[in-house]
């Protein structure tokens, strides 16, 4: 492909990745259809000019046979195919179950030998107030308990990442694997499984707190006693999955969430999540430090009830975000300690996409989260939340990628680090869809040709630095002080249909 660049405009370039199908390596650990994938990837590379792909590397597939019995064969074959085609790889360390969330068309559980532990001790799973277990990811309560053939949950994740590094060293060394996104919760996101469709949640329900397993219960009681309130228990008045905030004692106006007890609980609940991310990213940093690779973690775009005073859906997911308390900057500060990238979602959504009763505000949410990450000095990448094929969604993605547009004289003030398109399917290649998708990639690239040298657009990957300091409660409290967002233009200056 002949290339033609304007060097200053190239500094506005946002690389585009495409997420591979969930079952590209199937549950039997077989790369089942390399021919079809190769044909599709060639078209993405040669006709659309995409920069790379993102792929889930499922724990439930790799370590399915037993503790430390890792089998990377199918993934090595897949990655070698991708490398041969000249594409880069964003690899997700997927420690969660596939199945039970939006868009999950295949089922890949966590390893059977881990689930066997859960048969005898179901408290290893996140649990709601009624006692219903969520088996898609292990509870934070067992992060440091040696319940898994002598290993803790964090050791399971750490050993897996070490094995990945050893087995993929040549591809990391060659600059093919550029990002390691560390799964930190359900759907690979740093959150609690507060809105599981498998338990009957429907949009825009408030969701439920997921901290009623015996391990987290004990942790909370100890924290409450230490704070001088041994009588405090976990919330009993926070409602059920599909309630509205005003129907609950916890989230209603002047409800429990604004009381001393409610604030204590929310601080504990959200801090557990942030320290969970901090510990596992710390392990990932130890493993990958010194290698030319980026670390990343994904934060969920919980845009519904954002305009309700309680932000109930965010609170149940573990994001303690209110009009007068910043729930996202503390996460960004935690990531900054490990030189991590914040990966966000729902970039395609507009406030008008949902009914008024959802009190949904994805545009303001994206603006808030991206701004807070940039204020903490870290990079932000992102993806669309739902399948998107139209100009309206693409133009919104382009606006978020460069909120103040292209700078003809060099690097723009605000620019996302990368965009990952969800997801590769036959529908993408339908004629009109593919033509528009090609335009999206071209506009993301600031109307420049595909550029294989990331240094030319300011993305040279340097060896990952060692985590710089211990995250403290003071760090979180400081970052939680409210601060404004950057200004966004009303629309992108590079429309796909403009």
Curated annotation (Swiss-Prot):
The keyword Cell division does not apply. The active site is at residues 189, 383. Induction: Circadian-regulated, with a peak in expression just before the light period in short day conditions. Substrate binds at residues 56, 96, 104, 298, 303, 345, 384-385, 423. Disruption phenotype: Almost complete loss of beta-amylase activity in rosette leaves and inflorescences (stems). Its EC number is 3.2.1.2. Detected in phloem sieve elements. InterPro entries: Glyco_hydro_14, Glyco_hydro_14_CS, Glyco_hydro_14B_pln, Glycoside_hydrolase_SF. GO terms for cellular component: secretory vesicle. Keywords: Carbohydrate metabolism, Cytoplasm, Glycosidase, Hydrolase, Polysaccharide degradation. It comes from the Eukaryota. It is found in: Cytoplasm. GO terms for biological process: response to herbivore; starch catabolic process. GO terms for molecular function: beta-amylase activity. It catalyses: Hydrolysis of (1->4)-alpha-D-glucosidic linkages in polysaccharides so as to remove successive maltose units from the non-reducing ends of the chains. The keyword DNA repair does not apply. It is an enzyme of class 3 (hydrolase). It holds the Pfam family Glyco_hydro_14. Beta-amylase activity. Major cytosolic beta-amylase isoform in rosette leaves and inflorescences stems. PANTHER family: BETA-AMYLASE 1, CHLOROPLASTIC, BETA-AMYLASE 5. Belongs to the glycosyl hydrolase 14 family. This is Beta-amylase 5. It comes from Arabidopsis thaliana. The gene is BAM5.
